[in-house]
């Protein structure tokens, strides 16, 4: 898997809107908002994100390259040993190639965590483009001129058992009204950050269960003569395959969760309380009612929706 330094084209998918509900505001400190973003990632990986994320984009690339080199070195040794044991052992060569491909990949969960924390430390590098129906024209605008200048932030939550909508066969997704119930458990699904210039940046980080693709494999039947002629190397190879099948079965029973990231930004004529923003977003997405959200634009000097289209590693200095 090749990693490109222009991270956003891979890891900041352009999403028009995400399902956000009522937010809970927190103190106006950058450290608190950064810590809150960490809470979006999986519990068992959190410490790893904190340690590696603070090291920056170079650490991400270094780690990825190191893993790739290790995989290549292991592959070379394994391939050499396989050829020495039996040059015509197609079975082992195939196994080696498969192990190669899986070992060379950089963990996406870790990269998501690294990237989120790196971006929040370098917000001025984000380049935005106003959302339009014309996809051929892309403006790149720097809306955040200073790093770490977050005004406020709050969690975006949904009811644990609530689904925001469903997709029909024609591909259209419809939202449905629902009633709130007292004591209903809520889960955090995202984070909203506000800035002094009226910009609201929303990050939606969801967990998706990873389902392995079923692969059809044809195996040749063996008679007693084949068993006698089977080499020790071939026997070891078949034992390894049997163990791998058991591991895959366990992974299927306990599927690994992958992270899905989406970001959107809304620019108003002036800043206002983040609770008012998330409250309006709640009615827009959960209740399919955009009236309150549109009224924010009228109340605060207009509103423009932006998507994050790129990242500038050398952003221009703000003019005084």
UniProtKB/Swiss-Prot annotation:
Q: Which GO terms describe its cellular component?
A: plasma membrane
The region called Disordered is annotated at 160-181
Tagged with keyword Electron transport = no
- Where does the record say this protein resides? Cell membrane
Keywords recorded for this protein, A-Z: Cell membrane, Lipoprotein, Membrane, Palmitate, Signal
> Does the entry feature the keyword Lipoprotein, yes or no?
yes
Q: Which residues form the signal peptide?
A: 1-23
Say where the lipid (N-palmitoyl cysteine) is covalently attached. Answer: 24
**How does it sit in the bilayer?**
Lipid-anchor
Q: Please, where does S-diacylglycerol cysteine lipid attachment map on the chain?
A: 24
The protein's name in its UniProt record: Uncharacterized lipoprotein MG149 homolog
């Amino acid at each position: 898997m090749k990693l490109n330094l222009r991270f956003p084209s891979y890891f900041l998918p352009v999403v028009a809107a995400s399902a956000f509900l009522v937010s809970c505001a927190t103190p106006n400190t950058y450290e608190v908002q950064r810590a809150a973003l960490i809470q979006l990632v999986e519990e068992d990986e959190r410490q790893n994100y904190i340690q590696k994320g603070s090291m920056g984009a170079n650490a991400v690339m270094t780690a990825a390259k190191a893993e790739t080199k290790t995989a290549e070195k292991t592959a070379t040794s394994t391939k050499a040993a396989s050829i020495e044991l039996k040059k015509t052992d197609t079975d082992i060569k195939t196994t080696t190639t498969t192990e190669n491909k899986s070992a060379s990949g950089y963990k996406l969960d870790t990269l998501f965590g690294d990237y989120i924390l790196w971006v929040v430390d370098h917000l001025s590098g984000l380049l935005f483009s106003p959302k339009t129906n014309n996809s051929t024209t892309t403006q790149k605008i720097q809306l955040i001129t200073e790093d770490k200048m977050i005004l406020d932030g709050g969690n975006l939550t949904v009811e644990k058992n609530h689904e925001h909508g469903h997709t029909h066969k024609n591909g259209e997704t419809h939202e449905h009204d629902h009633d709130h119930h007292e004591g209903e458990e809520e889960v955090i699904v995202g984070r909203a950050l506000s800035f002094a210039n009226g910009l609201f940046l929303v990050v939606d980080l969801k967990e998706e269960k990873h389902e392995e693709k079923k692969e059809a494999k044809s195996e040749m039947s063996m008679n007693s003569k084949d068993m006698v002629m089977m080499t020790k190397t071939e026997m070891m190879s078949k034992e390894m395959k049997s163990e791998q099948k058991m591991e895959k079965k366990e992974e299927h029973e306990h599927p690994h969760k992958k992270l899905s990231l989406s970001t959107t930004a809304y620019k108003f004529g002036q800043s206002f309380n983040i609770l008012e923003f998330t409250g309006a977003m709640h009615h827009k997405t959960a209740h399919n009612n955009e009236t309150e959200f549109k009224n924010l634009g009228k109340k605060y000097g207009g509103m423009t929706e932006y998507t994050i289209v790129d990242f500038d590693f050398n952003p221009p200095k703000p003019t005084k």
